[in-house]
Swiss-Prot record:
Disruption phenotype: Growth and pigmentation defects associated with global transcriptomic changes and accumulation of RNA quality control siRNAs. It is found in: Cytoplasm; Nucleus. Mg(2+) 2 binds at E352, E394, D396. It comes from Arabidopsis thaliana. Substrate binds at E272, F296, R297, N298, C377, E394, K412, Q436. This is NAD-capped RNA hydrolase DXO1. It catalyses: a 5'-end NAD(+)-phospho-ribonucleoside in mRNA + H2O = a 5'-end phospho-ribonucleoside in mRNA + NAD(+) + H(+). Keywords: Cytoplasm, Hydrolase, Magnesium, Metal-binding, Nuclease, Nucleotide-binding, Nucleus, Phosphoprotein, RNA-binding. GO terms for cellular component: cytoplasm; nucleus. Residues 27-52 have a biased composition (Low complexity). Residues 103-114 have a biased composition (Acidic residues). Its EC number is 3.6.1.-.
Length: 544
């Protein structure tokens, strides 16, 4: 009897699991009928897994992540799949000779098949259209004034100068050490509060406490999209979306320096890029009545990542209009880039060109004319905890399942790993990869590993759900901690900022608190957007 014909692995890069993964959360949600029963939660018993990257929103774009041992050149990269007893090495190359990924079919239980990111605590949940939660009310701020209330009389907890010392010294600088911050002195005694200070959120909760908090995260739903084409024109369609090349393994050994001389670097559009996102929302007449936050993905990456990343400063604009908070991307000053820095950045864009279909490039033809300003942005709606978020996220490319379902794919470039760099890669870079992909609902990440000279050494496909599983197994980080932390931040923000006022949210040294500072102006992109929503026929006000 003739054996059944074997399926050519080159015909399908992602295999059947791609369709299962991309539709899993929806099938799970539609079959349950109860949003709360399908909600994702981060609990201590199941050790959730977790979190951040640049779009035109600042997610990192095609920037190469640089050396795994470097502190910050470019974006981060890569993941491998983990099981309880078997672990595939990051250094293994299963591509073989075929030049195509050997994506074997994954045998999963029926429940796992229904869930895009597995049955862990970071699964997506469906939630009702109207929130049942009221706007959070913040407790009264903590005060250093201990003269009133409990302990103000007698020999109580604090010393009061009567009848001998108290059981504990009064909070404040240690004697003889100066400073103006309660009880710290030494390292923190020179901390000076910004005169624009409005409020702060101290990062006092432990990761164990956050891990026990149940935080729902709704599966992102795409509402619209837009493209930026050559010349900078913005078109409200998917013209700029590229198709993933399933035979990327054929590019192993390619020089990522090709085309560097004609590279067009990405322009810093500032708030103008945010205006393009808001314009796409208006073009589709999408209501913001029940939306608490509008932002680029990059700002959510920063917030979720701060649960673990306590050494990278950042800030963002915070502007509340008509009950919706607009988070504007702010870029902090950077050190001047060397030629090597620019090349590493280009290697990421070059890999994106190699990994996507280009009808205009003949087989074997080198990459040329790479324009970092050409991009495609998806606009999605999701819900984190009690707050609905509308978010713009730049997407590298897409692929299509056997059943015609389109899904997005993230492309990353990073230095080849060795025994010294694997640990940091899993602790830090995979955390950023997971956040960037998870919050936008991207199921797959394809990583190009390169050597120090910019030559492509190997490629590897990672699934977003398995990144979280692996990190949890090794106790590196938990996705649920990042979600719980972000929920705390959004609750604090929404309950603190006032209507028609402008702020800056910053996270700076010594990285012990988030600070909300008063700002003096609102970007024209937001002002014009609000005006056009209320008066579609009238021209926007002149720039400030």
């Amino acid at each position: 009897m003739d054996s059944p014909p074997k399926k050519n692995p080159m015909d399908d890069l992602f295999g059947e699991d791609s369709d299962n993964d991309s539709r899993s959360s929806r099938s799970k949600s539609s079959s349950s009928g109860n949003a709360s029963s399908s909600s994702s939660s981060s609990s201590s018993s199941s050790s959730s897994s977790s979190a951040a990257g640049g779009d035109g929103e600042g997610d990192g774009g095609g920037a190469d992540s640089g050396s795994a041992s470097d502190s910050g050149s470019g974006s981060s990269g890569g993941k491998e799949e983990h099981g309880d007893d078997k672990v595939e090495s990051y250094r293994s190359n299963d591509n073989g000779e075929s030049g195509v990924y050997p994506y074997e079919e994954e045998e999963e239980e029926e429940e796992d098949e229904k869930d895009l990111f597995g049955s862990d605590n970071e699964e997506y949940t469906k939630t009702p259209a109207i929130s049942t939660y009221s706007i959070p009310v913040l407790p009264a701020g903590w005060s250093n004034d201990n003269h009133g209330g409990r302990g103000g009389m007698g020999r109580g907890r604090w010393s009061n100068g009567r009848g001998g010392p108290g059981l504990l010294p009064r909070p404040g600088p240690y004697p003889g050490r100066g400073g103006n911050r309660g009880g710290f002195g030494g390292r923190y005694q020179n901390y000076q509060r910004d005169e624009r200070f409005v409020s702060e959120l101290k990062l006092s909760k432990s990761k164990e406490t956050l891990a026990r908090k149940q935080t729902n995260f709704q599966e992102p739903c795409e509402l619209t999209c837009y493209s930026r084409v050559e010349g900078g024109e913005v078109i409200y369609d998917d013209q700029g979306l590229r198709l993933f090349k399933r035979h990327i393994g054929e590019e192993i050994g390619a020089d990522l320096n090709q085309g560097y001389d004609t590279f067009i670097e990405k322009k810093d559009l500032g708030s103008e890029g945010f205006g393009d996102l808001l314009g796409s929302i208006r073009a589709k007449n999408i209501s913001l009545d029940n939306i608490h936050f509008v932002t680029f993905r990059n700002n959510l990456n920063k917030i979720l990542g701060a649960a673990y990343n306590r050494h990278e400063p950042w800030e963002m604009g915070v502007h509340k209009r008509n009950g919706t908070i607009y988070l504007d991307v702010h870029k902090l000053p950077e050190r001047p880039q060397s030629d090597l820095d620019r090349r590493r950045c280009y290697w990421g864009y070059c890999f994106e060109s190699l990994a996507t279909e280009d009808p205009g490039r003949a087989y074997g033809e080198e990459i040329h004319h790479v324009d970092a300003n050409v991009e495609f942005c998806s606009v999605v709606r999701t819900k984190l905890g009690a707050h609905r978020v509308m978010m713009g996220a730049e997407m590298d490319c897409c692929d299509v399942s056997d059943k015609g379902k389109r899904f997005y794919v993230e492309l990353k470039t990073t230095r080849e790993l060795d025994d010294r760099t694997v640990d940091r890669f899993e602790r830090e870079k995979l955390l950023k990869f997971w956040i960037q992909s998870f919050v936008a609902g991207v199921p797959y990440i394809v990583v190009g590993f390169r050597d120090d000279g910019g030559r492509l050494v190997r490629t590897e496909r990672l699934t977003t759900r398995d990144i979280a599983h692996r990190a949890r197994l090794k106790n590196y980080w938990q996705g649920g901690v990042c979600l719980a932390f972000a929920d705390e931040v959004l609750c604090w923000l929404y309950g603190t900022v006032k209507e028609n006022e402008d702020y800056i949210l910053q996270f700076v040294h010594p990285f012990m608190r988030l600070e909300l500072l008063q700002a003096q102006s609102c970007p024209d992109a937001i002002t014009n957007h609000v005006h056009l929503l209320q008066n579609p026929a009238s021209p926007p006000p002149p720039p400030q």
